[in-house]
C-alpha cells in the first residue's frame, strides 16, 4: 500500500496571513493522522514564511506517525534538524522569491555538499531523501551521495496541459522510479498532486509514499480536513 504523507504547511500559511495563533498546525496534524495519514510532512523554509521552529518542536513531541521535515541545506536548519531528529528529512532546493518549490535538486551539480549533509543527518538517525526531477543522472548522483530515499518531483506531470504531455511526464516518472528501485533506493513522489491526477502516480508499482499538501488543505476548506485526507487515501488505495 502506498503511504500518504500529509503536508501541513498551508495550515501555517493561513495562520501567518493574519499573524495570529490559529489555525494550529499541530491540531491539523492530529486530525490528519486520525483520518489515516501515514506521516506528516512540513517544510521549514529559510524565510519561515509558514512553518516556524516551534511548530516543528511541538509536532515532534506529539506526533504518533513519522515526521518528514523538508529543508534546504542551510547550516542553521541542518543544525536544527540534528537537534530535533525527525524520522525523515527531505532535502529540497529553495529560492526566496518562489511561491513553491519549482523543481528538483541538482544533486549531480552539488554532490559533495549533499553527501556531507546526508552523512551528518544519518549520523543522528535521520533517514534522508533527496527531492529530484525524474532523471537518471540525478538518481545516480543521489545514490552516490548516500541518500537511501529519493522523492520524485511530480510538478511537471501535474502541470501538463495536453494529454500527450501528461503521458510523456508520467512515463518519465515511471521510468525514473523503476530505475531508482533497481539501484536499491526507496522511491517517494510528490508536488502538485490532486484528487484528479494522483491515481496514475499511485499506480506506479515501486512508489512507497506520496507527499501531498496544498490540494488536501484546499479540499479541506470545502469538505473538512478529515474528509479530504480520507478522500485522498481512498483514491490512492483504489489505484493499487
Swiss-Prot record:
Keywords: Cytoplasm, Pyridoxine biosynthesis, Transferase. The active site is at 43 (proton acceptor), 70 (proton acceptor), 191 (proton donor). It is found in: Cytoplasm. The keyword Cell cycle does not apply. InterPro entries: Aldolase_TIM, PyrdxlP_synth_PdxJ, Pyridoxine-5'_phos_synth. It comes from the Bacteria. GO terms for cellular component: cytosol. GO terms for biological process: pyridoxine biosynthetic process. Pfam families: PdxJ. The keyword Glycoprotein does not apply. Its EC number is 2.6.99.2. Pathway: Cofactor biosynthesis; pyridoxine 5'-phosphate biosynthesis; pyridoxine 5'-phosphate from D-erythrose 4-phosphate: step 5/5. HAMAP family: PdxJ. Catalyzes the complicated ring closure reaction between the two acyclic compounds 1-deoxy-D-xylulose-5-phosphate (DXP) and 3-amino-2-oxopropyl phosphate (1-amino-acetone-3-phosphate or AAP) to form pyridoxine 5'-phosphate (PNP) and inorganic phosphate. PANTHER family: PYRIDOXINE 5'-PHOSPHATE SYNTHASE (PTHR30456:SF0). Belongs to the PNP synthase family. This is Pyridoxine 5'-phosphate synthase.
Amino acid at each position: 500500500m502506498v503511504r500518504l504523507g500529509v503536508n501541513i504547511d498551508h495550515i501555517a500559511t493561513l495562520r501567518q496571513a493574519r499573524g495570529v495563533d490559529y489555525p494550529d498546525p499541530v491540531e491539523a496534524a492530529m486530525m490528519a493522522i486520525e483520518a489515516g495519514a501515514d506521516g506528516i510532512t512540513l517544510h521549514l523554509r529559510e524565510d519561515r514564511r509558514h512553518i516556524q521552529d516551534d511548530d516543528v518542536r511541538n509536532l515532534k513531541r506529539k506526533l504518533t506517525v513519522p515526521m518528514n521535515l523538508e529543508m534546504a541545506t542551510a547550516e542553521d536548519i541542518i543544525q536544527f534538524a540534528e537537534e530535533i531528529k525527525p524520522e525523515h528529512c527531505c532535502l529540497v532546493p529553495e529560492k526566496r522569491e518562489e511561491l513553491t518549490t519549482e523543481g528538483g535538486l541538482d544533486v549531480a551539480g552539488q554532490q559533495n555538499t549533499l553527501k556531507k549533509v546526508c552523512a551528518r543527518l544519518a549520523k543522528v538517525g535521520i533517514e534522508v531523501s533527496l527531492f529530484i526531477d525524474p532523471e537518471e543522472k540525478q538518481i545516480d548522483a543521489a545514490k552516490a551521495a548516500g541518500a537511501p530515499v529519493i522523492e520524485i518531483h511530480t510538478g511537471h506531470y501535474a502541470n501538463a496541459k495536453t494529454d500527450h504531455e501528461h503521458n510523456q511526464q508520467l512515463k518519465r516518472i515511471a521510468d525514473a522510479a523503476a530505475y531508482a528501485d533497481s539501484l536499491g533506493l526507496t522511491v517517494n513522489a510528490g508536488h502538485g498532486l490532486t484528487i484528479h491526477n494522483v491515481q496514475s502516480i499511485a499506480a506506479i508499482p515501486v512508489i512507497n509514499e506520496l507527499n501531498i499538501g496544498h490540494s488536501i488543505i484546499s479540499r479541506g476548506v470545502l469538505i473538512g480536513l478529515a474528509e479530504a485526507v480520507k478522500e485522498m487515501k481512498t483514491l490512492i488505495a483504489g489505484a493499487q
